[in-house]
């Protein structure tokens, strides 16, 4: 099973690199030739227009154009194999100055984009879509419509070179651990996906126990008579004047918290979700997501997240990512700084009179409140820095939210969080102020900054904080009910969201790695590989009373999850390098790796080009060996831990170019091409 998955993964990965290196593309003789162009007036169901009422748009192609006002208009094309294609419309949109929502359906599955105002013919990018082998129907539906279509072009997708993403931290003073983690992320990006799982925070996954405080004996005891150590600094008094300790600790080190409702002690099962992953797949995720939302100045309480993060990295060798659901008072106008508030009177949503712009204005209560928020956060991050724990830090996430509800696509009217409800300008100022305070005021340099982006329209790129302000960009995928491309209305959505992946890649000109920082359903491995959706990592949200994102069969296909976790494509906790956080500033001495190219200091003289596994024959397993050696050097490289790692002879054989320019993914593709008789090795 795993061997078969590896072979399929290798083929898909290698073919994905073909486009970025300018290599061949195959077209079946009886299939549509690409790029394919069709005039708007020739679409099925279209009518011929030469002007939009009194508005003329000159220089159209063909006899005229069509105007999307009534029913669907469509065309069909044949493709030789499942794959990704780009749809471009040469069109115009003169109805709405703020842009107009448009829908293209591919075999009934809908994709959406906002088309800007254009009173002359303009190329509108509808993104990448997956077409299936054989006949495909592409339709433009009149949901909002009123788009003029001169012609439509369908092209084979051109995949950008993912290797140009930087592993240089935006913080010039980044800690060695942060630098090392970034370099590792870069080493697997575009070749593998890292598994992740979000952990619940605060009072989540509360488990009730039989432990009670006995005032007569002054002990915490459970129904079996086991005694628990009282936290002497946690004594308090209830409304009836009875003393009790808020916390006690069991023989196994578990801390329990007093429940005022039931007068017993409870604990939070923060490991519930990763244990579920272990149960379903036999593996633990490599990344665990945390949140600092409990450290709000209104009700700050220590839920132990910092200690759990230290344990995850220093004891388990796992990678930490963290978001910051920081709350503000719902009625800021009635709030006195320092006043404690119940959680119910605070929010992280946009339903507050908190003026976000005032976080940058000295003398305002918002400015001082934000300072308290950052102080609480920094106190936790400093403990992590002192413990040598780097963090993929994702503050102010999901900034854009939904598309704007006004004519200004960047005004924040679609945002659902307070930090972005006042638009892109204020959002970027807030991001910069947080980053500057953490780095300059608190001396925090263990953070790998990650920004959430969406792809509702070309204006979505306006939310990007800039190359010098973030290290990664990410997308949060929640689409089991809406925005599906599989024709279903419920159940797990295994779509890879490839179009969005490459939209985000385009926003940053390929300079940053792109992750799926949150998700409901994990995309299927086959979708990711066939579509070349090389997300850096995935990270499902946690199980809760509201939604069972991990265990719920309406969110996850557990068979697909198991197959992905046990494939060579997916990196799990046990596959992370033992020295992951230790070599941020140290060069590699055995091999040299640059942009996916591996060279060795010495090479054997007897070379059988392409025979990477040294079995005296050239086949697809050699391509697999090359890709494994490049993607996971600690396991399959020259000194890898796996018994089947590549040897010096294998590395020499794998370099299929006579110029001996080092081993790259292009060599894996060359092996595949030689296997099917397209070329002869070596390459001259």
Predicted regions, residues:
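Cellulosome-associated attachment modules in secreted, modular CAZymes
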Residues: 19-26, 589-684
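Hydrophobic core
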Residues: 13-17
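Aromatic- and acid-rich polysaccharide-binding/catalytic face
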Residues: 460-488, 540-541
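Extracytoplasmic
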Residues: 29-178
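Substrate-binding cleft of secreted/luminal carbohydrate-active enzymes
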Residues: 193-200, 512-587
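N-terminal module-boundary/linker segments of secreted carbohydrate-active enzymes
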Residues: 158-225, 231, 241, 253, ...
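Substrate-binding cleft of extracellular glycoside hydrolase catalytic domains
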Residues: 293-433, 440, 444
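Aromatic-lined carbohydrate-recognition surfaces of secreted/lumenal glycan-active proteins
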Residues: 394, 435-459, 511-521
């Amino acid at each position: 099973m795993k061997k078969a998955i590896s072979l399929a993964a290798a083929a898909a990965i290698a073919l994905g690199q073909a486009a970025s290196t300018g290599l061949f593309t195959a077209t079946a003789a009886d299939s549509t030739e690409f790029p394919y162009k069709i005039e708007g007036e020739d679409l099925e169901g279209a009518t011929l227009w030469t002007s939009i009422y009194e508005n003329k748009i000159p220089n159209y192609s063909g006899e005229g154009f069509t105007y999307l006002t009534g029913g669907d208009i469509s065309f069909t094309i044949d493709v030789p194999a499942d794959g990704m294609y780009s749809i471009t419309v040469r069109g115009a949109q003169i109805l709405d100055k703020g842009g107009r929502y448009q829908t293209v359906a591919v075999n009934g599955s809908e994709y959406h984009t906002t088309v800007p105002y254009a009173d002359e013919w303009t190329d509108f990018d509808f993104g990448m879509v997956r077409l299936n082998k054989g006949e495909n129907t592409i339709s433009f539906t009149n949901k909002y419509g009123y788009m003029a279509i001169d012609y439509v072009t369908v092209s084979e997708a051109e995949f950008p070179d993912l290797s140009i993403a930087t592993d240089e931290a935006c913080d010039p003073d980044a800690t060695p651990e942060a630098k090392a983690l970034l370099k590792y992320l870069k080493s697997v990006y575009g070749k593998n996906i890292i598994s992740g799982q979000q952990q619940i925070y605060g009072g989540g996954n509360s488990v009730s126990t039989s432990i009670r405080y006995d005032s007569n004996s002054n002990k915490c005891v459970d129904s079996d008579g086991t005694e628990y150590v009282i936290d002497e600094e946690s004594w308090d008094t209830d409304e009836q004047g009875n003393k009790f300790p808020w916390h006690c600790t069991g023989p196994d080190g578990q801390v329990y918290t007093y429940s005022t409702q039931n007068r017993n002690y409870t604990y939070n099962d923060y490991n519930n979700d990763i244990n579920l992953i272990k149960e379903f797949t036999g593996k633990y995720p490599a990344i665990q997501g945390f949140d600092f939302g409990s450290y709000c100045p209104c009700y700050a309480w220590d839920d132990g997240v910092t200690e759990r993060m230290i344990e995850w990295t220093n004891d388990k060798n796992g990678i930490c990512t963290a978001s910051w659901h920081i709350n503000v008072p719902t009625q800021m106008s009635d709030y006195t700084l320092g006043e404690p508030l119940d959680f119910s009177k605070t929010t992280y949503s946009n339903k507050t009179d908190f003026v976000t712009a005032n976080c940058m204005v000295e003398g305002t209560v918002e400015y001082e409140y934000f300072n308290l928020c950052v102080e609480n956060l920094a106190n936790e991050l400093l403990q992590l820095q002192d413990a040598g724990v780097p963090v993929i830090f994702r503050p102010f996430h999901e900034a854009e939210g939904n598309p704007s509800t006004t004519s200004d696509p960047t005004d924040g009217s679609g945002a659902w969080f307070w930090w972005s409800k006042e638009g892109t300008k204020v959002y970027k100022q807030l991001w910069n102020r947080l980053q500057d305070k953490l780095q300059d005021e608190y001396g925090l340099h263990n953070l790998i900054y990650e920004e959430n982006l969406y792809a509702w329209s070309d204006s979505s790129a306006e939310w990007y904080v800039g190359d010098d302000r973030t290290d990664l960009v990410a997308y949060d995928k929640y689409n089991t009910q809406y925005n599906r491309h599989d024709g279903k209305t419920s159940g797990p959505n295994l779509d890879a969201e490839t179009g969005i992946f490459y939209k985000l890649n385009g926003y940053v000109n390929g300079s940053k790695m792109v992750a799926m920082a949150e998700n409901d359903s994990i995309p299927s491995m086959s979708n990711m590989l066939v579509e070349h959706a090389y997300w850096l990592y995935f990270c499902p949200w946690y199980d809760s009373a509201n939604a069972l994102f991990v265990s719920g069969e309406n969110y996850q296909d557990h068979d697909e999850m198991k197959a992905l976790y046990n494939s060579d494509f997916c990196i799990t906790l046990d596959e992370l390098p033992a020295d992951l956080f230790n070599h941020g500033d140290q060069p590699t001495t055995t091999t040299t790796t640059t942009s996916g190219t591996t060279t060795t200091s010495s090479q054997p003289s007897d070379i059988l080009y392409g025979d990477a596994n040294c079995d005296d024959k050239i086949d697809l397993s050699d391509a697999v060996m090359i890709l494994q050696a490049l993607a996971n050097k600690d396991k399959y490289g020259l000194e890898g831990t796996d018994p089947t790692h590549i040897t010096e002879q294998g590395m020499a054989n794998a370099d299929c170019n006579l110029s001996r320019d080092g081993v790259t993914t292009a060599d894996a593709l060359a092996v595949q091409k030689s296997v099917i008789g397209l070329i002869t090795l070596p390459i001259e």
